[in-house]
Amino acid sequence: HTGIRRQRQMCIRDRCKYIQVDEPLFARKPENALNFGIKNLERCFKDINNQSIEKITHICCGYPDKLDAVDYPKAPLDSYSKISKALDESIIDTVSIEDAHRYNDLNFLKDFKQTKVIFGLVKIASSQVESKEEIVLRINDALKFIDKEQLIVAPDCGLGHLPRDLAKIKLKIMVEASSSF
């Protein structure tokens, strides 16, 4: 915890507006997330009472080790629904979820009453480019369960698997799709 505490203090000192902790196991082991994981995640943000610093967590569902891999392990589809209420009741301001590489039943979004959701709409390990129309449809699907002010569009995760030109194309389409809202 000393390393996390040191990093947290540096972020506060440097006036970071956002502090994000990636969480690789909550979606794979939701029972552990509920039993002790979320409490430990909150400890990462201990003493950040400054309202100008947004506390974010990314809940990873799993990604392949190369572009366009098909059969690789992913977290169970019901994972987000098992932990959404507890995350909303935590001190986390924003939860980042992955939806593009495996569509979720978005009913769990209604559990987020106070927490914002970064909604993954672009596959980060696929060379297939999402259409503007499919992104718009998925945003509309999400807005059936969560207020527009709480929804932030984004790629599923980091863009490290994608060549730079492809990443730019995907992001441009995502921005165009989201600008219609």
Regions found by a protein language model. Give the residues of each.
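Active-site-proximal loop/short-helix segments
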Residues: 15-37, 58-67
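Single conserved hydrophobic/aromatic residue that forms the stacking wall/gate
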Residues: 1-12
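Flexible glycine/acidic-rich beta-alpha junction loops that bind and position SAM and/or redox cofactors
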Residues: 27, 59-70, 101-107, 160-164
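Active-site mouth loops of central-metabolism enzymes
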Residues: 6, 66-78, 126-132
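Short beta-strand segments at enzyme active-site cores
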Residues: 13-23, 54-59, 97, 150-155
